[in-house]
């Protein structure tokens, strides 16, 4: 399989050399294969949020390299980096990050508009992804008029409309009720298995993580443990994840 993301010996140190320093990441290496659904877990302060920020190119490592689609993103700067991020990386955040003065349809279209795509093509692409996520009936609605679960589906559509190399989820179910969370996770799993969308999910929630094929557990800035689902039922994988999380906290 093709490696679409390669992280090699990434470290991140906060603070100047003459001040008190904090090492958030300490030599992390792993890769993501095309079509993989991978989870990142760890307690608060473990380094998982720092890793996500570096993966999403919103922060730079102190040392090490990150390759996405065979491009070393640590060498990109300014507009070049912004263009790469817009085309190659999709984001789903916990708090949706929708623009309240735009309809669902307009929110989904934003990344394509920024890339200068023609309006006719934008409309086609927006309707295609909206159909895929079962939200065509709310395309003319504003965020204030739709539910949390629907908002997150709009956010997912916006993230996927550019057909990015990888979809990054930062606690995407965190603001949802249990039914909406399950619906979103079922959709993400379907996008992964049927459309081969590559997904990296950062979460503290064992139920969300049980949808992944492989999970990296981060502790003290290093990969403490890795576990694969290997054909287990989701219930069995969920129990295994809970056990590992319990051991991590000891």
Predicted regions and their residues:
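Conserved ABC ATPase signature
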Residues: 142-146, 150
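Short coil-to-helix segment of the ABC ATPase nucleotide-binding domain corresponding to the Q-loop/switch region
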Residues: 102-110
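A short, proline-enriched helix->beta-strand linker immediately N-terminal to the Walker B motif
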Residues: 161-165
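Conserved ABC transporter NBD signature motif
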Residues: 64-72
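Hydrophobic anchor residue at the start of the ABC signature
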Residues: 156
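Catalytic Walker B motif of ABC-type/P-loop ATPase nucleotide-binding domains
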Residues: 167-170
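Helix-to-loop junction immediately C-terminal to a conserved catalytic motif
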Residues: 56
């Amino acid at each position: 399989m093709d490696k679409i993301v390669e992280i090699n010996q990434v470290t991140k140190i906060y603070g100047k050399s003459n001040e008190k320093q904090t090492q958030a990441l300490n030599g992390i290496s792993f890769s993501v294969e095309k079509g993989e659904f991978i989870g990142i877990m760890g307690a608060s302060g473990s380094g998982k949020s720092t890793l996500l920020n570096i993966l999403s190119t919103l922060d730079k490592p102190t040392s090490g390299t990150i390759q996405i689609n065979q491009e070393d993103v640590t060498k990109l700067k300014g507009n070049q980096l912004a263009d790469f991020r817009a085309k190659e990386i999709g984001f789903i955040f916990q708090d949706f990050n929708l623009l309240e003065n735009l309809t669902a349809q307009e929110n989904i279209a934003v990344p394509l508009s920024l890339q200068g795509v023609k309006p006719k093509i934008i409309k086609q692409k927006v309707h295609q992804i909206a159909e895929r996520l079962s939200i065509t009936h709310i395309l003319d609605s504003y965020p204030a008029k739709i539910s949390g679960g629907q908002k997150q589906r709009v956010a997912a559509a916006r993230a996927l409309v550019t057909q990015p190399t990888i979809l990054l989820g930062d606690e995407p179910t965190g603001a949802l009720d249990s039914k909406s969370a399950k619906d979103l996770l079922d959709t993400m799993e379907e996008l992964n298995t049927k459309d081969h969308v590559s997904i990296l999910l950062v979460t503290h929630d064992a139920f969300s993580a049980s949808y992944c094929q492989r999970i990296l557990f981060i502790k003290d800035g290093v990969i403490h443990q890795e576990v694969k689902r290997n054909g287990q039922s989701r219930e069995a994988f969920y129990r295994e994840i809970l056990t590992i999380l319990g051991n991590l906290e000891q």
